[in-house]
Amino acid sequence: MSLSEGPGGRPLLAVRALGKSVPGPRRLFRHLDLSVAAGELVAIIGESGVGKSTLLNILAGLDDADEGSVAIDGIDLGTLDETARTRLRRERIGFVFQAFHILPYLTLRQNVALPLALVSPDAVEADSRADAMLDAVGLDGRGGGYARDLSGGELQRVAIARALVHRPALILADEPTGNLDPDTAARVLALFATAVRGHGAAGVMVTHSEASAAIADRVLTLGADGLVDRRG
């Protein structure tokens, strides 16, 4: 098993020999391999400019690698046209970003239910699942409230609930607690890790912070020659 591979069984995320360059002679990374199993959270750290966010965009099918392959739940992104990629993102991927992007004119329930509206017309079921996810992140009975009523940490909890409500195979997080104070960030990260594991998703989080990365099952460093396991 390579340093970037997780436990046995078919991974929910399988990346093989990935390479990406930027305009000019500079290569961000090459020979990148990564396997992430159900219920596993992997943190990828690295300095600014090494390609962490670019890697997430490739994993989400928003950007193309120069070489290699990405498969999500057994589906090779390279075999899909843009319409099929969009459908896969909506159905199988959840996103958590540093910016919360909670719409102020919608209730918290409606914000969390947004991914369901893209894949299912059943509004009653969507509301029920949104309320259940809000309960799961510690916002019991708050579905009828609005973003203005919440702290930064609570807003990120809403973002985590929204990322998980459609039961995705893969959760991608880009500096998910970068705007939070250290105590709030630690609580939100613990909640995020518990949610990923509890829902059986594969989680990939990129961060520059080793303290944030410590919550993960594996910590990998991204460099020009791929990923290196920080925990040996």
Language model segments and positions:
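ABC-family P-loop ATPase nucleotide-binding domain
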Residues: M1-G19, D229-G232
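ABC family nucleotide-binding domain
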Residues: L12-L13, L18-L222
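H-loop (His-switch) and adjacent beta-strand-loop-beta switch element
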Residues: V219-G232
